[in-house]
Amino acid sequence: MNLDEPRKPAPASQSEPYIVCEDLFKIYKQEDLEVVALRGLDLKVQRGELMAIVGASGSGKSTLLNVLAGLDLPSAGRCLVGGRNLLTMTPADLVTYRRNEVGFVWQQTSRNVLPYLTAVQNVELPIILDGGDPGVARRRAYELLDMVGLSQRSDIRPDRLSGGEQQRVAIAVALANDPPLLLADEPTGELDSQTASEVFGVLRGLNQELGVTVVVVTHDPAIANQIDRVVAIRDGRISTESFRRVSFDGREAYVYHDEYAVVDRTGRLQIPKEYLERVDIQERARLRLVEGMVEVLPEDAPVEDEE
């Protein structure tokens, strides 16, 4: 890898997704109990895409991110990143994958940077550890810090940086070896709303400038609303996807989101909880095909003859 020549953005291919998860399961064993974190999850992400994963605590979103990062192996299914199946990689292959294919940003800033190194030293360290030339590593570090807006803070240690600045350094560290995939687990979770928006702006800018694929786990609806595609996970499966749209009326631009329920490969459909509560659907429901539509009714709904 030539760090003096940054990777050019790759054109997105609708026929060959960069990330493919099929029927993905992850089961954790805790003493005599088994906890199923992912339950047959299916997901496709295009190369160069910027997307968010949302969901309640325990829904499986951080587990999915750890699997994509090569930090945790799924129990069953397929997980392909760039055409390579993470389930069949050797331990040595996974180390190489984590070093060069993926960058990771944690929520806790203390996990992202070393406190006794300056910002530029933190960024150049992964390059040097991977056998890169120190001179090239230093130039690359300065370039990345400039891209995240910290060119004037490069010689400062993390304890003298604000929380937002520390996360910007963390993003630069994650991109040091020019990975095509950047994963961020609640990167703005410990920041105020204004700083969180600024940090997300950095992620969006890097996605556009470098062509890096970015997957962000977030609880922040304000951040999620700025992303073109948001995937919601519930009970270890993808439940809904929403897409950000922009329309023009000749004078102004309007931003809105189209939300879709996801039907998996076995035909399972997760209906949003608020919908179930509104129509009082609990354990069972009636399905009826009416004029090209499928109606979902409470089990005690009156039965009408179908035409």
Set out the residue ranges of the language-model regions.
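ABC ATPase NBD coupling module
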Residues: 32-33, 86-102, 134
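Helix-to-loop junction immediately C-terminal to a conserved catalytic motif
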Residues: 69
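Conserved ABC transporter NBD signature motif
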Residues: 77-85
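Conserved ABC ATPase "signature" region
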Residues: 84-85, 124, 135-153
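Short coil-to-helix segment of the ABC ATPase nucleotide-binding domain corresponding to the Q-loop/switch region
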Residues: 115-125
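A short, proline-enriched helix->beta-strand linker immediately N-terminal to the Walker B motif
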Residues: 176-180
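Catalytic Walker B motif of ABC-type/P-loop ATPase nucleotide-binding domains
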Residues: 182-185
